[in-house]
Structures are given as C-alpha cells and as structure tokens.
Curated annotation (Swiss-Prot):
It is found in: Membrane. This is UPF0494 membrane protein SPAC212.01c. The lineage of its organism: Eukaryota, Fungi, Dikarya, Ascomycota, Taphrinomycotina. Disulfide bonds: none annotated. It is a multi-pass membrane protein. Its main location: membrane. InterPro entries: DUF999. Belongs to the UPF0494 family. Keywords: Membrane, Transmembrane, Transmembrane helix. One of its GO terms (cellular component) is external side of plasma membrane.
Length: 280
C-alpha cells in the first residue's frame, strides 16, 4: 500500500509542496514548482520598464528641443567654419594687438597701392617734370630711362614707406581709437554729471517753490485770523446757520434770519408788524 503522505504530496500541486513552498502563487510555475521571477529578475525587469517609460516620455516631450539643439549646433558650426575660412583668406588675426602679414595678396596689393600713390603724387606735384629738368640741367637726361628710373625710385620709396610705416599707421589707428573711446567716456560722464546737477537743481527749485508756497499760505492764513480776531468778527460756517421763524415782510414774503441777526433786527420786525396807514 502506498503511504498517505506520498499520496498527499502527489495530489497537491507542486507549488504547495514542502520543498517549493512560496507565498506568491502568481509567480510560481505550477508544473515545476519553481519561482517565475526571482528578486533580481524582478528588479531588472522593473528597471527596464521604468527606463522604457522614461524613454517614451522623453521621446514624446523633448523632440522639438532636440531638433532645436541640432539646428543651433549646425548654425554655430557653419558660422565657425565661415569665420575660419574668412580669416584664412585675408589672414588678419589680431593676437595681442598685432597684425600678421603672412597673406599671399600682400605684395601685389602693396605694389598696386604704390603705383597709384606714385601717379597721384606725380600728377599733383609734377615730380617727374621737376626731376627731369634737374637732371637735364646736370646733363644726366635721357628721354626714356630717366622717367622710368624716377618712377621706379618713387615706387620703391612708396613700398618701403608702406612696409615700414604700416606698424606706425596701425599704432596710430589704435591710439586714435583709444583716444576716441576715452573722450566718449569722459563726455558721457560729463553729460551724466550735468544731468545729475540739473536734476538736483530742479529738485532744489521744486523744494524751494513748495516751501515758499507753504510759507505764503501760512502767512496769509495767520494774517486773516489776526485781522478777524482783532476786529471782533465771528466767522459763521454753513453748519452754524439755522432757519428762524418765517416772518412776514411788508411785501408778504418770508425772510430767513440767523441767530446772529435776530437780536439786531428787533426794531425792524416791530416796524414791520405795525399797521400801515390806509390811504383815503
């Protein structure tokens, strides 16, 4: 006969036997009696699900920002490339206030500028004619070579002046810029100080005006009070005026009298109450 405990073990599901006793039935493989999800697996799956949700959230919320960042980065790269190419083209870096002279176009430009300056000077001051006359007087004149030599000498002089005086010209430009900036700052400070002075004067004038107005008003009020009190007048306000009894006048009209006028008008009232003589 079989043991009843063995029968009980066979009848019960593997998940409830003594060997594989677990609390959560949903995470148990009933066929093999094993845990479906161990804590490590559960943590990994929860982390993956959380990361997936975060990625979905970021993908749905931040695509526009990513696109904007990409566009701005492309624009910055384009501007940087353009600046570097432009700098390479004319080679005008300014480290420590110095100008580099490594450009390939420097000598052709200097020669062109020298030729233009030579012709301008010759047209203005007639240098070639003056030197030709001087050479002719000293018997060194030649119709072809002397003018050419004169122009070549002038060209060399212009080149040397442009080469050696370029640094002085740049220094003069820098000094001029600094002077203009300093003068602008000084003028701005002077204008600001003048504005502050004008504003202070305006405030002082306004305060003086208010003070003078207050003094005049107080003096007028004090003088008015002194005059009223010295003359013995009594100031009657609209609230102090009361309506007296209506008294008939000789015209049959009613008159309003205040308390101050009742005592002084007794004689007039008696005269009004007297019978008027009847004409025959």
């Amino acid at each position: 006969m079989s043991n009843p405990e063995s029968l009980k073990k066979q009848v019960e599901p593997p998940g409830y036997n003594e060997l594989f006793m677990v609390e959560d039935v949903c995470n148990v493989d009933l066929e093999q009696g094993l845990d479906l999800c161990k804590p490590e697996k559960v943590n990994k799956q929860s982390q993956r699900s959380r990361q997936s949700r975060q990625s979905l959230f970021t993908n749905t919320i931040k695509p526009q920002k990513d696109k904007m960042n990409i566009k701005t980065n492309k624009i910055k790269e384009f501007l940087n490339d353009l600046f570097t190419e432009f700098s390479k083209f004319h080679n005008s870096y300014y480290p420590d206030g110095r100008i580099s002279t490594r450009s390939n176009f420097r000598w052709p430009l200097l020669i062109i500028w020298s030729i233009i300056i030579v012709f301008a000077v010759d047209k203005k001051f007639e240098v070639q004619k003056f030197l030709s006359i001087w050479i002719n007087e000293n018997r060194f004149y030649s119709e072809i070579w002397v003018p050419i030599a004169i122009y070549v000498c002038l060209l060399v002089l212009m080149l040397l002046s442009l080469i050696f005086f370029a640094e002085f010209a740049v220094l003069a430009l820098r000094v001029t810029g600094v002077i203009i900036a300093v003068l602008g700052a000084v003028l701005g400070m002077i204008i600001a100080v003048l504005g502050m002075i004008i504003a202070a004067l305006g405030m002082i004038i306004a305060a003086l005006g208010a003070t003078i107005t207050g003094l005049l008003y107080f003096g007028h009020w004090a003088l008015y009070k002194l005059v009223i009190l010295s003359l013995g007048f009594k100031i009657v306000t609209p609230g102090d005026v009361c309506v007296s009894n209506t008294l008939p006048t000789h015209n049959g009209e009613t008159a309003l009298h205040s308390e101050t006028t009742v005592g002084s008008d007794i004689e007039q009232i008696e005269l009004q109450n007297m019978p008027t003589p009847v004409k025959k």
